[in-house]
């Protein structure tokens, strides 16, 4: 199985949107009641232009998008460390457990290091035990002592 990892582009919008919808259906089946709104239109609107909100890398198998990782760079002031925030890591359910997610995370780690960063950071739905187990196998640990909050504006 030859997997090509490359930056995502505008032409990947439909495939990204389709994989996102597959992931949203999986999370709903686990009880996630988020109003999942990301789609090909949001990908194009927010990922490109003069001030893109995120970047992405894709794993391609036989020319088809098999998985992707969308990220944004950030900074953690308490520890004075640059971070790569993983917004989404999604692998097509038909090709899971074949190393695609691992390869995307390793590629993201390289992007982070190359940008002067020191860690990857992300959130995971608390009932997504398969994802949590995968991240633990990578060596990730849970962050304690903080709660994530949001405030619509």
PLM feature spans:
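Conserved GNAT-fold acetyl-CoA-binding loop/helix
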Residues: 21-45
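A short helix-loop-beta-strand connector motif used in the catalytic cores of GNAT acetyltransferases and
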Residues: 45-58, 85
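Conserved beta-hairpin
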Residues: 54-67, 92
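A short, internal acetyl-CoA/4′-phosphopantetheine-binding micro-motif in the GNAT/acyltransferase core
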Residues: 89-96
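Conserved GNAT acetyl-CoA-binding A-motif
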Residues: 113-123
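Conserved beta-strand-loop-alpha-helix junction that forms the acyl-donor binding cleft
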Residues: 121-131, 150-153
